[in-house]
């Protein structure tokens, strides 16, 4: 039978949590129970943060595209609809990069979107 609660295993487990709590302040870095709780909480926040990061970046890209599109006389939603009508599939990250680093190229996309929107309005 395998023994899971030996003194050696307990000490190793304890050291693992205390080692991971090295940068914490106060009792958290010295007390096993608190260190363990904060270790698990930190792991959960790290996991959740990785999910939130995706949301935050998408929101940032949309904001940047919207600002640049409005400077060129279109709203964000109109720009995206116009690009879809033109069968141009460029992702938001690249559009945001163009809007910041290469405004003339972004203006070309806006111009194409405007043309497509006008064609749709005529129909």
UniProtKB/Swiss-Prot annotation:
InterPro entries: Ribosomal_bL20 (IPR005813), RIBOSOMAL_L20_CS (IPR049946), Ribosomal_protein_bL20_C (IPR035566). The keyword Ribonucleoprotein applies. It holds the Pfam family Ribosomal_L20. One of its GO terms (molecular function) is rRNA binding. Signal peptide: none annotated. Keywords: Ribonucleoprotein, Ribosomal protein, RNA-binding, rRNA-binding. GO terms for biological process: ribosomal large subunit assembly; translation. PROSITE patterns: RIBOSOMAL_L20. GO terms for cellular component: ribonucleoprotein complex; ribosome. It comes from the Bacteria. Belongs to the bacterial ribosomal protein bL20 family. Binds directly to 23S ribosomal RNA and is necessary for the in vitro assembly process of the 50S ribosomal subunit. It is not involved in the protein synthesizing functions of that subunit. HAMAP family: Ribosomal_bL20. This is Large ribosomal subunit protein bL20. The lineage of its organism: Bacteria, Thermotogati, Thermotogota, Thermotogae, Thermotogales.
């Amino acid at each position: 039978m395998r023994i899971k609660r030996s003194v050696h295993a307990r000490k190793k487990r304890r050291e693992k949590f205390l080692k991971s709590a090295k940068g914490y302040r106060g009792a958290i870095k010295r007390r096993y129970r608190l260190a363990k709780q904060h270790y698990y909480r930190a792991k959960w926040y790290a996991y959740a943060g990785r999910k939130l990061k995706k949301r935050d970046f998408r929101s940032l890209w949309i904001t940047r595209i919207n600002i640049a599109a409005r400077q060129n006389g279109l709203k964000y939603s109109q720009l995206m609809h116009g690009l879809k009508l033109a069968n141009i599939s460029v992702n938001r990250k690249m559009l945001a990069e163009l809007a910041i680093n290469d405004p003339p190229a972004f203006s070309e996309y806006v111009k194409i979107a405007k043309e497509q929107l006008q064609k749709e309005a005529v129909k």
